[in-house]
Amino acid sequence: MTIKIWATSEDNSIEYMALTADYLEGALGVLRKSFYRQEAASVAVGIAKDDEAMDEIDDFVKTVAKEGVSLIALDKKTNAVCGVAFNKLQAKKTGDEASDFHRLSEICRRPPAKDLIKFMDKADKQTDLFALCEADCLLEIMFLSTLENYGNRGIATKLCEVSVRLAKTLRYDRENVKQDIDGKELDLEPIPEAVCALFTAPRSRRIGRRLNWTIAVTLGYEIFFTNGEPFSKFLPSDNRFTTVEYFII
């Protein structure tokens, strides 16, 4: 399958493309160097201080990558991954069926990994995005991150834009642009009808405003706990809440 190039930066230095097996380790490296150390919930639970916890989240991310809708930003000069959007397709559950995040939190062994996934699950459950979007499937930008030395170049914003374009291509063009990291042919369905994300810091929330996303709910960090302590205890005073946001395509 031809690798889909979704966009190129104005200075032609960065390509935005589907995640493939060749770049999986580089994409995971972005999480280790940036996301686990800087993202608010990751900081609160202390995941970067626990190698086994990072391994557990890495394993989960590898599984998510097999859904074929994750994206990377690639430095064309160095051929290195400098940004990533690990995206997950979330299908509407029926009855009392447990969410994917809930099931994962049950099998995580390391407390930081368990608490990070429980945060994601609890935040998602504070509002019914499927009802708000009148959708049976959502594309969730699960982990969005850029290497620190590539900051202030609009990479995370472009990854969000391209995630929306990918979802629109699946829904309206019926073009199967899913890219399996194992090289397998993936089914076109499920097809997302909206894109959503948890924006956990002021910088990521500015992306939501810039791209005209809708805030579904705002949640104070004092309602999320790790090792018996609220997230708010471990985060700076200028970041006291997270938002659940969406964009209907």
Task: Map each language-model feature to its residues.
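Short amphipathic alpha-helix that is part of the acyltransferase structural core
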Residues: 2-59, 65-129
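Short hydrophobic/aromatic beta-strand or adjacent loop that forms the aromatic wall/cage
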Residues: 68, 239-244
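Conserved acyl-donor/pantetheine-binding loop and adjacent beta-alpha core of acyl/acetyltransferases
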Residues: 42, 80-151, 176-184, 217-238
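Conserved acetyl-CoA-binding loop of GNAT-fold acetyltransferases
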Residues: 172, 209-219
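Structural signal for hydrophobic/aromatic residues that build the beta-strand cores
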Residues: 27, 71-73, 87, 141-144, ...
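Conserved GNAT acetyl-CoA-binding A-motif
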Residues: 136-141, 167-200
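Glycine-rich acyl-CoA binding loop
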Residues: 152-160
